[in-house]
Every structure is written in structure tokens, then in C-alpha cells.
């Protein structure tokens, strides 16, 4: 049975841990607000670029741009995995890694067994996990979220495009966590390349406005495609960053509440042990007094 000193030491230790988790929750809440604002602000721009690409694709031969053209056969795949750099964020990284592993080993199982699936790991956690398990990692960005910058998104997009244009990969998939709300992040697996432009609603029904493009639609597409890829990668990174802070804030809040409950239980145990010790001492005193009276 634990002594009073043991219980008291444990209560003090849990109280110290609770202070840390509470502070981390407050820090994550402050970072979440900024990260959430950045992710939300990036969405309209990314969506508009996608819409413009869809509108232009109806007016040009998309086969003229290789990034818009499907390959007859997918022989090599590049999977981009966006995880965090730090832990203590609940199941955030575990869920992303689970989905990424499924994309690699199940959705592209035959290619994976033939060594035709490569990975690009953005974030330390994913890089550490997949490297230790012998997955083929062609490029990694550990420490990415310690100094998040658009130039890294552009570098990843250019790397993926270059590999696709050279024919070294026939498909690029991105696995990331999309921020929907604090309690409900959404795991996403999206095909980045080849680009499949989405037709806007008016053009689906044939009632689109006849725009005049200057320069030509094909020239605009050649400029728009790299911007689209850069923006999509950047948006995914911002979404993942916001989802990470939300997950960490929730995890630290849960840890703080658990510490509070554990301290409550330990204090009850401490008081009971203290009462038992006092009762034992009183019993010994009474027994001693009775023994003296008997003499």
C-alpha cells in the first residue's frame, strides 16, 4: 500500500504536469487562431484558380500541356505526406501515417512491391516513421512547420512537376489533414498530378459566358498551371498546420482534465490513508493507556 509520502509526491508531480498541459493548451489556442485565419484566407484564392483552370480547359486542347494529360499506364507513383514536426497532438500524426501507408501499400500495392512508389515527407514525424520502416523516400522536409514559408510549397510543387514531366512518375498523390473544425479535422488523399480541371457549373450545362482571352487560353494555362500547383500545396500545408494546432489544443485540454480527475482521486486516497494513520495512532495510545491502568 502506498504511504502518505508516496501519494503526496505523486499529487505534486501530477500538479506540475497539469500546469504544463494547461500552458500548452493556451499556446496552441493562440497559434490555432492565426493558423486558422491563414488557412481560411488561402481557400478562396486556391478555389478561384481551380475554377479558372476548369473554365480555360473547355476552350483548349488539354493534351498540349503534359501536366493536364493522363498517362496511358501508371508505372511510378509519388506520394506526398504532410505530417507535423512535433508530437503531443493526439492521433493527428498516427491517422495521417495510417492513411498514407494505405495509399502506398494497398491502393498501389503492386507498384509498391515492385519498388515503384516513392514518398516525399513534409514534416519530421512522417519522415522518421517511414524512413525507419524502409520506405523509399526521395525527398524530405523535416522541421518544415517550425518556419512555414510559401517558398517550400513552391519547391515541392516544382519537384513534383519536374518528376512528372520527365516521366519519372506518372501520378502524384498528396495525403494531408484538412481543417474543418477544432473537433473534426478531415483526412484527405488527393491526386495532385495529373491535374483534372473541374468544369464550372455554367459550362457543364452549356450556358457559359463567352469570354475573350488575351493572350490565348493555351498561353494563360501554361502560366496558370504552376500557380495552381504552388497554391494547392501551400493551402494543404496551411490546412495541416491549423489541424495540428487544433489537435494539440484538444489533446492538452483532455490531458489537463484527466490530471484534475486523477488528483481528485489521489486526494481522496491521501485523506483516507491519513485518517487510517490517525486512527491507528489513537488506538495505540488508548491501548497503551489501558495497559498502564491495568498495572
Swiss-Prot record:
Keywords: ATP synthesis, Cell inner membrane, Cell membrane, CF(1), Hydrogen ion transport, Ion transport, Membrane, Transport. GO terms for cellular component: plasma membrane; proton-transporting ATP synthase complex. One of its GO terms (biological process) is proton motive force-driven plasma membrane ATP synthesis. PROSITE patterns: ATPASE_GAMMA (PS00153). Pfam families: ATP-synt. It is found in: Cell inner membrane. NCBIfam families: ATPsyn_F1gamma, PRK13425.1. Belongs to the ATPase gamma chain family. Produces ATP from ADP in the presence of a proton gradient across the membrane. The gamma chain is believed to be important in regulating ATPase activity and the flow of protons through the CF(0) complex. This is ATP synthase gamma chain. The gene is atpG.
Amino acid at each position: 500500500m502506498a504511504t502518505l509520502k508516496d501519494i503526496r509526491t505523486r499529487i505534486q508531480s501530477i500538479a506540475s504536469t497539469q500546469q504544463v498541459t494547461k500552458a500548452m493548451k493556451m499556446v496552441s489556442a493562440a497559434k490555432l487562431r492565426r493558423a486558422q485565419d491563414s488557412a481560411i484566407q488561402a481557400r478562396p484564392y486556391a478555389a478561384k484558380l481551380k475554377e479558372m483552370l476548369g473554365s480555360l480547359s473547355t476552350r483548349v486542347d488539354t493534351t498540349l500541356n503534359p501536366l493536364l494529360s493522363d498517362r496511358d499506364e501508371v508505372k511510378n507513383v509519388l506520394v506526398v505526406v504532410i505530417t507535423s514536426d512535433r508530437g503531443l497532438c493526439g492521433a493527428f500524426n498516427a491517422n495521417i501515417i495510417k492513411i498514407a501507408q494505405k495509399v502506398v501499400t494497398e491502393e498501389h500495392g503492386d507498384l509498391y512491391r515492385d519498388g515503384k512508389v516513392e514518398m516525399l515527407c513534409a514534416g519530421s514525424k512522417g519522415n522518421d516513421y517511414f524512413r525507419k520502416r524502409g520506405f523509399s523516400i526521395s525527398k524530405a522536409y523535416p522541421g518544415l512547420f517550425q518556419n512555414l514559408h510559401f517558398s517550400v510549397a513552391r519547391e515541392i510543387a516544382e519537384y513534383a512537376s519536374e518528376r512528372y514531366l520527365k516521366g519519372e512518375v506518372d501520378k502524384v498523390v498528396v495525403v494531408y489533414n484538412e481543417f474543418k473544425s477544432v473537433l473534426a479535422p478531415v483526412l484527405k488523399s488527393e491526386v495532385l498530378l495529373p491535374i483534372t480541371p473541374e468544369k464550372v457549373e455554367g459550362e457543364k450545362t452549356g450556358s457559359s459566358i463567352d469570354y475573350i482571352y488575351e493572350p490565348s487560353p493555351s498561353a494563360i494555362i501554361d502560366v496558370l498551371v504552376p500557380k495552381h500547383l504552388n497554391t494547392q500545396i501551400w493551402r494543404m500545408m496551411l490546412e495541416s498546420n491549423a489541424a495540428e494546432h487544433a489537435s494539440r489544443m484538444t489533446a492538452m485540454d483532455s490531458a489537463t482534465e484527466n490530471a484534475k480527475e486523477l488528483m481528485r482521486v489521489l486526494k481522496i486516497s491521501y485523506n483516507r490513508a491519513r485518517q487510517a494513520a490517525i486512527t491507528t495512532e489513537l488506538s495505540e495510545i488508548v491501548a497503551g493507556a489501558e495497559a498502564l491502568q491495568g498495572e
